[in-house]
Amino acid sequence: MIERTFVGENVSETLIDEYFKTKLVRAGYSHIDFKKTPIGTRITVFAEKPGFVIGRKGKMVKELTETLATEYSVKNPQIEVKQVENPDLDPAVVGHKIASSLERGMHFRKTAHSAIRRVMGSGAKGVAIIVSGKLSGERSRTEKFMDGYMKHCGEPAEALVNKSHQLAKLKLGIVGVTVKIMRPDVSLPDEIVISSGEIKEVSEISEVSQE
């Protein structure tokens, strides 16, 4: 019974997270933090632009609160809004900006290079950006852009690397954008890095469209 309740809560949080992603696009939405209290549920929303989450005269935050209570059955939801400390070190915010740029017609390579420079300029130990889909033709492919130090597997990758996945809707189809950032404050025992400042690129053809 406890396990079923735990799974149900996780599913609910995932659905709410997806709802906020869609609803708070202009706010530079990052993530949410749930905490149950004796009088209800406190939900902390982290975003690049808190003002857009609150809305004019609190209109948006009231709408979000009502939706959580009526459509997601959250008991007495209380929304708190916090600003992301450094948007260029937040993979969700970085990924959203990349996706938005792609939707506006910016070239994926230029967009990724620009994002990597901002991330590394903010002090990140390393960054990886993976863009997958029909980027410039009928062939779907995967482009990877990396700089600095990055753990790709094992416990360090899970504990020290922040990740996010966003979607960009282009004329050719849906393009996935994955961002991985190694935070500035991490300390690794095997770290010996001499960074040249050169962004590495890897291109892979993943499938061929039959259309």
UniProtKB/Swiss-Prot annotation:
Keywords: Ribonucleoprotein, Ribosomal protein, RNA-binding, rRNA-binding. GO terms for biological process: translation. The keyword rRNA-binding applies. Residues 16-85 form the KH type-2 domain. GO terms for molecular function: rRNA binding; structural constituent of ribosome. GO terms for cellular component: cytosolic small ribosomal subunit. Part of the 30S ribosomal subunit. Belongs to the universal ribosomal protein uS3 family. Binds the lower part of the 30S subunit head. PANTHER family: 30S/40S RIBOSOMAL PROTEIN S3, SMALL RIBOSOMAL SUBUNIT PROTEIN US3. This is Small ribosomal subunit protein uS3. It comes from Methanococcus maripaludis (strain DSM 14266 / JCM 13030 / NBRC 101832 / S2 / LL). The lineage of its organism: Archaea, Methanobacteriati, Methanobacteriota, Methanomada group, Methanococci. The gene is rps3.
